[in-house]
Amino acid sequence: MGSGPIDPKELLKGLDSFLNRDGEVKSVDGISKIFSLMKEARKMVSRCTYLNILLQTRSPEILVKFIDVGGYKLLNNWLTYSKTTNNIPLLQQILLTLQHLPLTVDHLKQNNTAKLVKQLSKSSEDEELRKLASVLVSDWMAVIRSQSSTQPAEKDKKKRKEEGKSRTTPPERPLTEVKAETRAEEAPEKKREKPKSLRTTAPSHAKFRSTGLELETPSLVPVKKNASAVVVSDKYNLKPIPLKRQSSIAALGDAAPPAEKKYKPLNTTPNATKEIKVKIIPPQPMEGLGFLDALNSAPVPGIKIKKKKKVLSPTAAKPSPFEGKTSTEPSTAKPSSPEPAPPSEAMDTDRPGTPVPPVEVPELMDTASLEPGALDAKPVESPGDPSQLTRKGRKRKTVTWPEEGKLREYFYFELDETERVNVNKIKDFGEAAKREILSDRHAFETARRLSHDNMEEKVPWVCPRPLVLPSPLVTPGSNSQERYIQAEREKGILQELFLNKESPHEPDPEPYEPVPPKLIPLDEECSMDETPYVETLEPGGAGGSPDGAGGSKLPPVLANLMGSMGAGKSPQGPGGGGINVQEILTSIMGSPNSHPSEELLKQPDYSDKIKQMLVPHGLLGPGPIANGFPPGGPGGPKGMQHFPPGPGGPMPGPHGGPGGPGGPVGPRLLGPPPPPRGGDPFWDGPGDPMRGGPMRGGPGPGPGPYHRGRGGRGGNEPPPPPPPFRGARGGRSGGGPPNGRGGPGGGMVGGGGHRPHEGPGGGMSSGSGHRPHEGPGGGMGGGHRPHEGPGGGMGGGHRPHEGPGGGMGGGSGHRPHEGPGGGMGAGGGHRPHEGPGHGGPHGHRPHDVPGHRGHDHRGPPPHEHRGHDGPGHGGGGHRGHDGGHNHGGDMSKRPVCRHFMMKGNCRYENNCAFYHPGVNGPPLP
């Protein structure tokens, strides 16, 4: 229809050609056209108009045509739509239309209209709609019942018509049989033979399925037989026999249970003929009575049947000859046949509800097989028996209540203690699945219920009325002496204070400054064969003072030295008596609080005292001899052998590697070692990636068992290609990428190593390494740093770009770009760009930034005191542009070093790429 509003009058005018004055559809053709218009209807007005037209139509042909064309399906669609939109008026109109249509069961099965209407009758909110839907449901139920009952009746009629001939012959047969007493017809004989043969099989099913077929005729025959048996045994009050008869009748009933209504005329017509022809009467009433008796006795099939068999077996033998004689006698009893008619009718009323037991049929067959000849006599007393049977059956059906004393029954169960059962235990998978489904449903319901719950109180708070209680009659504890005892006790003890905060927030954080633990060195003489106890340090600064009483801190250099000496074995000095390191430290430190740690490095005999501490521990090897080479023996750390070379041979490395040749100054001289860089300050295990080996450019394991990354190659070996960015000078933690120098450096004691971005540097012992980007510089034994100028190492050397400067042990090196500076041991060097510096350990660099020398990432040996760097102290000044931190001295933006925070020190110390609070950046807040 159009999109605008619809006028129903205009719509009716358009449909005027199909409708008469009352709005009823005129013809079958008109309803099909109206249906096509209904399919296009979208507005509620037009739909209601069409529904009213259908309501006005009275012709069943037109309505049936509407249903056949598809109107019922269309109404189903409209019903579904209006139900989803909850359109009550349209729903009522559709229900009225459905009630008006002549629907059948087949129509109701086509779609879910019936289901929707039933839902509306139960769950609709509108009461009128509910009533209307319930009325429609009841009407449809009546249609279903009537059609379901008429359909089998129609089928039976068809069958009966087909079998009418066979059915009509059986009543005629008894007439001919009784009169002529000759059973010449083949059909009856066959029927008798069949029960005999079928007795062994299960004929009950056959009879139950084929109602009114050939097996019916034997059912008539057994009826007679049962009747004859009753004649003989009725006086003896043989109750099971009537039951048997019922079973036989059940077979008859099985034959024709569906056509119950049709049986009544069959029963009545024979009754009318009974008066005229007496012999016809018995078989017909027996059919009806037998069927009713079977129905009455249906609920008690099993036990009674057995009893019947017991009683029947002796009596059945007698009647068989008796019946053979009295085949003509049924006429005597037939006058009573009119009597059974009324009971049969009464029973017919009971018939519809009672089911026919198929179980009894086989026994029927047994009785029939036992006495086929006795059938004629049985019908005689059948009329009387059925009444008794029905009475007995009714007695059995009566409801009896127990006596008062038996109304209650008590059952006692003794619980065995050992038979406790876990009720909550899941027995099988199905039960577990049920429990899970229930739990899921419960969770879903609670979630749905609480989804919009804001946990706000809906009920306003009402202050309760104050309770006015009378004063207590007894004061609790008035006569107690315990309160005085408690009061006396509290006078002499501290008061217990429980400070409850006003809010439940976390307490204010207490200020906590981690204090580094004091380092108490072990007695050197006693630690000969003992592995020292290594204490894990708490987070904090570097090590504390060596003496337990002193509060002053050792400089990091000395603290690391002490740790390294404690880690290794301490053999006695060459004189046989161990040197007391504690005394040397106290002599260096002086009074505990007199000097800061920087000033300690400026003492004139500082280097000598350091040598005294290091020599007995083998950290510098044995003392010098005539030709400047140490003797063999366990001089190196960890007991490594030094093989004495010839006068012109190279100095062997500490692990058996070949040492480099002597530096420019000459033979290896003693001097303090470079600072240790970690928990194991001197030696790395094999393959330590951070100290030697491939990660830092070390040349890999060498001839010795534990090749150390710092002494990777001998002084004479060519350096490997420089790895990018970082390396280690002598295996220490080298600078980061901005420094641009690194690579495997010279060993501290062994052969001169190299730094690919700096050139191989000289080792501490000997070997002339060089740093190609710095110029040749002497290690402790000699070396050079090409880009810095020839500078003296600890044993001598030079750094070309920095000017010649003296090493610790001797040799006058200089650093041309920095100015002359004095080495520690001798030889006043100069640094041209920095100004004159004085020789000895107190050379200074006027233009350098003040600070501790140990912070230099390139890390020249910290004991190679360079004197004053500006206002700084000797050996401790920052080299402003020559070294210092990679990041301008402040590493606070880097992650905090966890080793430093956990242990108090870090193996990489100043060369560590992470943030050490208070060392390479501001302390933590």
From Swiss-Prot:
Compartments (UniProt record): Nucleus; Chromosome
Top-level taxon of the source organism: Eukaryota
Motif, PP1-binding motif: chain positions: 394-423
UniProt KW Cell cycle keyword: no
Biased composition (Basic and acidic residues): 153-166, 174-196, 596-611, 846-871, 879-890
Region span, Interaction with WDR82: 418-619
Residue span, TFIIS N-terminal domain: 73-147
SUPFAM superfamilies given in the database record: CCCH zinc finger, Conserved domain common to transcription factors TFIIS, elongin A, CRSP70
Region (Disordered): 147-211, 304-398, 536-555, 587-890
Modified-residue entries (Omega-N-methylarginine), positions: R668, R696, R741
Record GO terms (molecular function): DNA binding; enzyme-substrate adaptor activity; protein phosphatase 1 binding; protein phosphatase inhibitor activity; protein phosphatase regulator activity; RNA binding; zinc ion binding
One GO cellular component term: nucleus
Annotated stretches, region: Necessary for interaction with PPP1CC: 393-408
Protein name as it appears in the record: Serine/threonine-protein phosphatase 1 regulatory subunit 10
Ranges annotated as biased composition (Gly residues): 540-551, 656-665, 728-766, 775-829
Zinc-finger ranges (C3H1-type): 891-919
GO process annotations (BP): negative regulation of transcription elongation by RNA polymerase II; positive regulation of termination of RNA polymerase II transcription, poly(A)-coupled; positive regulation of transcription elongation by RNA polymerase II; RNA polymerase II promoter clearance
Biological role: Substrate-recognition component of the PNUTS-PP1 protein phosphatase complex, a protein phosphatase 1 (PP1) complex that promotes RNA polymerase II transcription pause-release, allowing transcription elongation. Promoter-proximal pausing by RNA polymerase II is a transcription halt following transcription initiation but prior to elongation, which acts as a checkpoint to control that transcripts are favorably configured for transcriptional elongation.
Positions of region (Necessary for interaction with PPP1CA): 357-433
Segments of this protein annotated with the region Interaction with TOX4: 1-348
UniProt modified residues of type Phosphoserine: S313, S382, S545, S591
PROSITE patterns: TFIIS_N, ZF_C3H1
Cross-link position per record: Glycyl lysine isopeptide (Lys-Gly) (interchain with G-Cter in SUMO2): K179, K262
Subunit structure: Component of the PNUTS-PP1 complex (also named PTW/PP1 complex), composed of PPP1R10/PNUTS, TOX4, WDR82, and PPP1CA (or PPP1CB or PPP1CC).
Modified residues (Phosphothreonine): T398
